[in-house]
Amino acid sequence: MTATTTVRSPLRQRLRRAAGALVVALGLVLPLAAPTPVAAASTPAPSPTQTPSHAGLLLSLLPDANGAYVSGSPLTATLTLRNDATTGLGAGTVHLELGRTALADRRAVGAWLDGSADAPALSPIGDVRTTVLDAEGTSRTQVVVPGADVGALNPGVYPLRARFEAAATGSPTSSAESRTALVVAQGAPATVVTVVPITAAPDGVLLSATELTALTAPEGALTAQLDGVAGTPAVLAVDPSIVAAIRVLGTAAPATAVAWLSRLEALPNERFSLQFADADTTAQAAAGLTAPLAVDDFTPFLGPAGTPTTPTPTPTATTATPAGAVPSTTDAIAGARTDILWPRGEVTADQVATMSHYGPAGGGTVSILPSTSFTAGAQGAAVAARGSVGGSSVLVADAAVSAALSAAAAQSDASARGGALITANAMLWFDAPGSTVLAGLARADTRSEEGLSSAVTAFSGGLDGRLDR
């Protein structure tokens, strides 16, 4: 059960709780400078923290609307207390505290959420009384704090904390805290176009029939990826080796895989082709290749049972297609753009220039780069989604927003997903109001269907996902 209570007096409120414990799982525009050789941002996005003082106790506070708050309105949030211990938890109090000074920048937001920064000055805005919680039990309360108790807040991102303290004298000392944020908009919110990589790592060169059967089964990872993006404005970045693996099998291809491919190509989403096997174009440009590696001859992939026979684990360039070979369209994806590259990691200006000619027949391309490739982005600032490097047009994926949405996409648990979305919203505040932000989800073979859908739609503004927006 979930109890819903409106706080009726400032600072000291009693909220009725469900009589029985609920046992559930809880997880919780700027001018562009030339890219600089800074390290790639590889640390996970900070999420609202749940810090227990003893093993087994977790506290989560998740403001509604992904943390978005209108000054003067009631603050509504979900408060979850989970007791993973084998003994019951005594009654206590959850103190709600709000910082009145907005966090200065993204780094300050990240440090607050991940617990690496000391708490700033916080003011109490309410107390929630908790009852005894059984071992391995979870209680969940909808909290409503009147706007008068929250107070007026100027646009900004504000630290919000919940602290649990045991009340009963003589009971084991128990405490925990949860850090989160309130986001007060400064104008029209930024909208996010999210690029979703559709990939699957094979054990060999190409996915085998056995692997495809598992991946495209009702509970398979590739099925979950299509389920997650269906009906959303996601931009799809598809590894053509998946398509090739299905087509080279011919009549030996699993029926579920054939149906999956048909479904993929029927989706209305904008999509582009990754390099074959998601090969990294940065490394190829660094090696001085004037054209990207490609697989033009699929004959080596055809074995007696329709499985790959070549031991070569990486794409190899060929100059001609031998007679009798499978046509080069084997890896073609219906409706996919071929003028977009998504290199991994950081790049140099020279590499961007080289990759700008990696299109078909030496045609032009546009690379998607992480914002950390740029001076401002490396310092934690927001960077415009469009720009140029040395005369080459580029798209820029916001690294902080991408990391937070990637964390959300990986979560099947609503509480954990909600925390990641609050982080994304807090980071988005620092983008220009009304701007379009590009986010690129991390490459991952498995994602939660619910998490992926939520990550794509949470900040899309209901608009179509297109790279030319």
Task: Give the ranges of each region predicted by the language model.
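Metal-dependent polysaccharide deacetylase catalytic core of the NodB/CE4 family, i.e.
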Residues: 230-345, 349-351, 358, 392, ...
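Active-site beta->alpha N-cap acidic-glycine motif
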Residues: 178-266, 270-273
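Asparagine-centered strand-capping/turn motif at beta-strand->loop junctions
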Residues: 81-88
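Secretory targeting and sorting signals
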Residues: 1-41
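Short glycine/proline/serine/threonine-rich loop/turn segments at secondary-structure transition edges
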Residues: 149-160
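Proline/serine/threonine-rich low-complexity linkers at boundaries of modular beta-sandwich domains
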Residues: 44-59
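Short aromatic-acidic-glycine turn motif
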Residues: 97-121
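Catalytic grooves of carbohydrate-active enzymes
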Residues: 82, 227-228, 234, 320-469
